[in-house]
From Swiss-Prot:
PTM: Phosphorylated on some or all of the serine and threonine residues present in the C-terminal region.
Modified residues (N6-(retinylidene)lysine): 325
An example Gene Ontology biological process: phototransduction
Native source species: Hemigrapsus sanguineus (Asian shore crab)
Protein name: Compound eye opsin BCRH1
Location relative to the cell: Membrane
Gene Ontology MF term list: G protein-coupled receptor activity; photoreceptor activity
């Protein structure tokens, strides 16, 4: 094993080589002997990265961890406390929060520990495989849960009362199916189809997407199709048709209002336009965030298998992985906490949270009482 004491001491400015490391040293030279067998030949072609990257990534992951714990923990807590939130649709939201929270608690602490311990994998090879499998399980579960959430919203908005109703039994089945799919596609590397290896700057573990044999290629193509392309297609299909259905509905409403009352048309147009813009923006944000976070990592995987892998540097692999895991931070805010019912639950159960959402039932009662008072007078 290469001597890592010298470079670590020298990085503060010997100036003998880039970042103070001896010439010819690679990023793989810092890996302990017990996990050397998990380093792919690809990583021996790259010099060590600036050590400050390890500390920067550690700080970023700590920041994301705090946000993820707060957001996903809040969603689960509110669901357990508020009876009004215990609906079949919200079961999918809670399943998403649960998978994101498990990703956080199983992947973030070891990664941060490695980052602040010199940027090396500090655990055993077996734990590297477990770490990668847990990240794969929770990541795939989140992707498929998002797919099911988008399809449920499509069914509600586009089919309305004519579509099949989401029951508690169906929601339970869908949540279970997401976990079965994720576990089913994450276990094969333990049995010889595909493998888990050290990745990027070698302080985390993931799929092997560089070895170009039939075993690795077929496994990675399958997970790309079933764990990225298919759910991505459903998500895009759902939100495209949601936006189309909303615009078609509002156009029909405007036409009807125009026939009935020209005065109401003006007031309805302003409100309708705001609603259209708000829903279109929400759909665009949902789809855009999903693709922004997951597409770079999927692209790196395919390039590593089928394209020019020389351009895939340690940092170029690490940053897309960070982007993909950041989903666990924004998901609870986009899909739950921004919803009026969740905000109302925060107001009721956590009044110190500085969220003041009005109960629509109270508003209706006040309006009704005001109307009755005016009629009596």
């Amino acid at each position: 094993m290469a001597n890592v004491t010298g470079p670590q001491m020298a990085f503060y400015g010997s100036g003998a080589a880039t970042f103070g490391y001896p010439e010819g040293m690679t990023v793989a030279d810092f890996v302990p002997d017990r996990v050397k067998h998990m380093v792919l030949d690809h990583w021996y072609n790259y010099p060590p990265v600036n050590p400050m990257w390890h500390y920067l990534l550690g700080v970023v992951y700590l920041f994301l961890g705090v946000i993820s714990i707060a957001g996903n923990g809040l969603v689960i807590y509110l669901y357990m406390k508020s009876q009004a939130l215990k609906t079949p649709a919200n079961m999918l939201i809670v399943n998403l929060a649960l998978s994101d929270l498990i990703m956080l608690t199983t992947n973030f602490p070891p990664f941060c520990y490695n980052c602040f311990s010199g940027g090396r994998w500090m655990f055993s090879g077996t734990y590297c495989e477990i770490y990668a499998a847990l990240g794969a399980i929770t990541g795939v579960c989140s992707i498929w849960t998002l797919c099911m959430i988008s399809f449920d919203r499509y069914n509600i908005i586009c089919n309305g009362f004519n579509g099949p109703k989401l029951t508690q039994g169906k929601a339970t089945f869908m949540c279970g199916l997401a976990w079965v799919i994720s576990v089913g596609w994450s276990l094969p590397p333990f049995f010889g189809w595909g493998s888990y290896t050290l990745e990027g700057i070698l302080d985390s573990c993931s799929y092997d997407y560089f070895t170009r044999d039939m075993n690795t290629i077929t496994y990675n193509i399958c997970i790309f199709i079933f764990d990225f392309f298919l759910p991505a297609s459903v998500i895009v299909f759902s939100y495209v048709f949601i936006v189309k259905a909303i615009f078609a509905h509002e156009a029909a409403m405007r036409a009807q209002a125009k026939k009935m009352n020209v005065t109401n048309l003006r007031s309805n147009e302003a409100e309708t336009q705001r609603a259209e813009i708000r829903i279109a923006k929400t759909a665009l944000v949902n789809v855009s965030l999903w693709f922004i976070c997951w597409t770079p990592y999927a692209a790196i995987t395919i390039q590593g298998l089928l394209g020019n892998a020389e351009g895939i540097t340690p940092l170029l692999t690490t940053l897309p992985a960070l982007l993909a895991k950041s989903c666990s931070c924004y998901n609870p805010f986009v899909y739950a906490i921004s919803h009026p019912k969740f905000r109302l639950a925060i107001t009721q159960h956590l009044p110190w949270f500085c969220v003041h959402e009005k109960d629509p039932n109270d508003v209706e009662e006040n309006q009704s009482s005001n109307t009755q008072t005016q009629e009596k007078s």
